Structure formats: structure tokens, C-alpha cells
Amino acid sequence: MGLTLAMAGKGGVGKTTLSALTIEWLVARGESPVLAVDADSNANLHEALGVAYEATVGGIREAARSEVPGLQGMAKQEFLDLRVQAALVEEAGYDLIVMGRPEGRGCYCFANNALRDVLDRLSRQYRHIVVDSEAGLEHISRRTLLRLDYLLIVSDASVRGVRTARRVADLADEVALPAGSRGLIVNRVPEAGLSETLRREVEATGLPLLATIPLDPAIAAMDADGMTVRALPPDAPARRALSGLLERLYEGRESASQAMPTYDNPRGTNDTR
């Protein structure tokens, strides 16, 4: 069973760390190759993984507007194929591609359509795909990226974060996001757990609560020192909590129809709005 999932949420809730830990979890299980996609315009997944990148899909899109019109036929597609392949950061067990900033002014129809074809072919070479997405779902909603099996919306343990998660879910509905199932992860939960106020906010999202990830001092120390997720101990509470969720998703112990509402019924039956 392959996983194609995206972590989405407002900046600062820890979705990039969770994305990096997910990639590491898959590689550690021998589930390579994995494609890591940084779809946040403020790219920092590479830092969490401890790698560097030189080119972005956004840069390729800009180059396509200026350079491709002078090419003919297959040369256009070959140009984009070569550029995307060159943009891949190849690591042990996974490759990383950085989407970069959204398009600027002007017509990008050809570039987007051609890139979509290139990325679709590229994605078929991988067993699993993990997308680190910003709350605006820019690259996913524009169909620059493929259909998702899971949209995992990440919040921190704050009312503002959970309300943003709800808006992300609303946006996913508005743009008919190509995601099979979705759910909520509340990150950085204190030892006392979720307050009653926060529980009510979670219920109001209409999203199933898939997991709570504990506030982990080891992650705070890791971030403070600029270290990568490899520095997080195997028994770190946050790592163990996320691993438990990934096990359930990967092994199919929760069927998508029972664990998370499908796109046809994204809010489930309890949403009365």
C-alpha cells in the first residue's frame, strides 16, 4: 500500500518537522524510493532533512515562459523534463523537489500544463510521496501536483491554529482538492492534554482528530540548535506518536472510509453548517 499524503497548515505549527519525520519513517522501513515535495513557498523542508537545493519548479516555470516558446515539438517537453530532473535533490532513500514560489503575472497555462505532465510521470517512479504544503494549498489546488490519498491538516494546540485548520478544510472543499481523505493532527499538545475549549474547537472543524502529538522538548532543542530530524531520539514522544498514526494509515488498520471522511463527504455527517 503506497502513501501519497500532504501535511498542510499555517506556518509555525510544526508541519514541516512532521513531514520530515514521515519521510524518515518511510525510509527507515525500507519503503524507498520516497519523493519529498516542498510545496510551501517559504521552503524549509530541506533544512529539516539536512539537505540543500539549487533549483525550484517555480524557477523552471519562469524559464519555460521565456525560453520554451522558441522551441518546437518534443524539444519543449524535453526542456522541462531535463530541468525537473536537474532540480531533484537525490538522497539515500528519497529525492526532494522544491516547488518554490507561485506564479507571477501573465499566462502560465502552457508551463503549468507541461509541468503537471512532467511531475505526474516523475511521481510514478516512487513508492510513496510526502508533500509539505502551506495553508493556501497553492500547488495542490492548481493541480500542479497529483491527487492525494490523505490530506493531514496540522494545527498546534491553540484556538487560532485549529480555526486555521478549519479554514484549510473549507478551502480544500472550495477548490475541489483531489484528496481521498482528510483529518486533523494537533501538534505540540501539553502534558495536560487538550483543554475543553480546544476540544470544542476541534469538534467544530468537522474533521476527525487523527492524532495528538505531544509537546516534545527534544524538538524544541533540535530547532534551537538548527539540527535536522535525524537528531531526534528514536524514543522521542513526538516521533512515537506520529509513528503510531503512520502505522495505522500504512497498514490499513483504519480504513479510509471509517477513519476519515472521503472527498464526496468531506465533513462527515456531523457537520450542521
Annotate the PLM regions.
Residues 173-273:
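C-terminal lobe/tail of nucleotide-utilizing enzymes
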Residues 110-212, 221:
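Conserved catalytic-core segment of NTP-binding enzymes
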Residues 4, 36, 94-96, 209-212:
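Conserved beta-strand scaffold positions in the cores of enzyme catalytic domains, especially
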Residues 3-41:
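Walker A/P-loop phosphate-binding motif and the immediately C-terminal alpha-helix
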